[in-house]
Amino acid sequence: ILDYPEYSLDMFFEGVPMLRSFLLAPVSGNHDSLYAVRRRLPMAGQDARTGNYWFVRAGVLFIGVQIGDRYFPNHTDFMASVAESAPEHNWTVLLIHYGLRSNGVHGHDAPVIGFRDTLEPMMDALGVDLVISGHDHEYNRTALLGGDAPETDTASILYAQPGERIYITLPSGTGLKYYDDSRSADFPFTAEGLEHEPGYVFFDFSPEEISLSAYSAATGEEIDAVTLRRGAPITEEE
C-alpha cells in the first residue's frame, strides 16, 4: 500500500525471508501509486500498456489485471491476446484487486462496476473458473455465477458448467483496516465472514478440481471450504 507512509512498505519487507519460499503474483491496489517502481515482473506474458500479465503454473492459467489503467479497451485487448497465446491448461484464475462480485462496502463503486462489465464477457470467452479479489477487507464467496447455475448452492462440492465461475473476496491478512458490515449485493453468496478479524485462504489445484479453505488467523477456525469440479455430479447409478 504504497501511497501510505514508508513504514507500511518496511512491514512488508520484514517478511522477505519467508516470502522467498513462495511464488508471488501481485496485482496493483487502489493505493499502489508506486506499484511499477517497487515490483518487477519478468514474465513474457506482461502487457506494456496496462501492466497486466499472465503465466501458467502446474496446469493453471493465472491472469493478473492491474486496476491503474481505466481505459477499459486496453484490458479487452489484453484478455483477447491471452486467449490467443496461452498454452493448454486445466484451470483459469483471474486476479484483480477490486471485488468484481463482492458483498462488501465497495461492491457498487463505479470503477468496480466498470471493470466487471468489461472483463466478464472476456472471462466467458477464456473460460475463467475462479476470480480472486480483495479491496473489501472481508471474506465472501459467491455461488456459482453465470450460465445456468442455480441462484444458491451451499453444497461442499460444486460442479461448474461452461460459463460458470466462483468469485472469492479475500479477507484482511493483517487486521490493519476493516469496514463496517455492508450487505448490498444483488447476486447470491454462499459464504461470508471475517468482517473484523484477519484471515487467510488456502487454494489447492489438481487437474480434476480446485479446493479452497478459508480460516480465521486469530483462532485457526475454518470458516469456509468448497471444491469446484467441472461437469455434472456422478450419481450412484453411473
Residue ranges and their predicted role:
Residues L2, E6-T92, I113, T118-L119, ...:
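Extended active-site neighborhood of metal-dependent phosphoesterases/phosphodiesterases
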Residues S133, R141, A225-T227:
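Residue-level detector of high-confidence beta-strand sites
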